């Protein structure tokens, strides 16, 4: 029985150490993913485009109202798009004007999912986070249809729980979902 207790304690200790290590890797991977997204967004920071935003004024308050929908002028006239609270909370950029500008930029200069994955993998290696990574990108078009791309294509990882999700664009129409497996 003493041998069984010793083995059980050793196994429990290994399990707890691994669980703690995975939690640390997950935090490092989340931070690296967000940094990689910012690196891709920053490549477009100096690009000038015409973007008209109405309804904005110079007055702000400390308690900015979180929008539950936005209005966008399309070829079909003014369209109302609902923004889920979850999407807004996980949006890379919160300020309406900047989200609108970024949404217009991404229409003209889309992010390369392959480049984003390469940058994320590089940051993971720098942080010594092992394992495999995958990015699922979902774009919601003006008619609210979704188009999904996974890089690399690996159905087994997509079925697992995601590590983190970030949204870009005025309507939060660009969804980037990060997956890792150790």
What are the functions of these language-model segments?
Residues 1-13:
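Extreme N-terminal signal-anchor transmembrane helix of membrane signaling/transducer proteins, especially
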Residues 9, 23-180:
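The feature marks either
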Residues 13-19:
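Juxtamembrane transmembrane-helix termini
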């Amino acid at each position: 029985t003493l041998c069984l207790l010793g083995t059980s304690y050793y196994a429990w200790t290994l399990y707890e150490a691994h669980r703690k290590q995975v939690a640390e890797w997950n935090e490092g991977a989340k931070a690296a993913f967000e940094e990689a997204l910012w690196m891709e967004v920053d490549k477009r920071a100096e690009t000038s485009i015409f973007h008209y935003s109405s309804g904005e004024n110079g007055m702000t308050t400390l308690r900015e109202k979180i929008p539950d929908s936005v209005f966008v002028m399309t070829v079909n006239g003014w369209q109302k798009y609902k923004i889920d609270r979850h999407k807004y909370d996980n949006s890379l950029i919160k300020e309406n004007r900047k989200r609108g500008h970024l949404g217009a930029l991404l229409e003209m200069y889309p992010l390369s999912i392959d480049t984003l994955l390469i940058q994320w993998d590089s940051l993971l290696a720098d942080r010594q986070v092992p394992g495999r990574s995958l990015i699922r990108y979902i774009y919601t078009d003006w008619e609210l249809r979704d188009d999904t791309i996974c890089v690399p294509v690996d159905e087994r990882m997509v079925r697992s729980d995601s590590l983190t999700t970030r949204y870009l664009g005025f309507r939060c129409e660009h969804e980037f979902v990060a997956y890792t497996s150790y």
